[in-house]
Amino acid sequence: GVVGIILSGGFVEDVFVQLRESTIRSHLGHIQVYRAGYSELGRRDPLAYLIEEPATIAQDIESLPNVEAVMARLSFSGLLNNGKADLPIIGEGIEPGKEAELGTAVSMVQGRMLGDEDAYGVVVGQGVAAALKLSTGDFVTLVSSTPDGAVNSLEFEVVGVFRTFSKDFDDRAVRIPLAGAQELL
């Protein structure tokens, strides 16, 4: 009985450790930096809370002792179109090289992760790929609103399909290079 309790306790502890690590490596990081007011009002208007001079802030943080890596992400929402249908998505602009360096809890089920050479590449969640019948090599159009309310769109090539620990995330998530997200928005 005691051995069973100890083993099940260890199993539960391991599940929590893996959940924490996959959340850190897939979505949030250990620490997030954002402008004052973002946590209260930024969910409604995230583009109003963009960080001024992000490269300078990243350099300052990276120079701190015990900091191993700093990377930027830009979250946005929009529509992904395969030429036949639209799907509402949540998007992240990422720094592909730094993502690869840090490691991630994203598992590729088709294709590959984004690389620095993929200026207009996109990786999509497994649910997104299924809903729009996407495979690597397909082209999609990503549509989003700019901060001043205009609608912008860019074409991307699907370079990979990923899976995370969260099916809900995979059903709506896409990742593009940070520069592409900045151009889109």
Model-identified regions with their sequence ranges:
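Alpha-helical transmembrane segments of integral membrane proteins
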Residues: 1-4
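Hydrophobic, regular-secondary-structure patches
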Residues: 9-90, 112-113, 117-118
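Short beta-strand/turn micro-motifs at beta-sheet edges
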Residues: 21, 180-185
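Short, charged/polar surface micro-motifs in flexible loops or helix N-caps
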Residues: 39, 96-98
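Extracytoplasmic/secreted envelope proteins and their assembly/folding machinery
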Residues: 55-58, 178, 182
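Hydrophobic secondary-structure segments that place a key small or acidic residue at a functional site
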Residues: 73-76, 85-95, 107-179
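Cytochrome P450 core scaffold surrounding the K-helix E-X-X-R motif
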Residues: 98-106
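Residues that scaffold the ATP/ADP-binding catalytic core of kinase and kinase-like folds
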Residues: 101-102, 131-132, 184
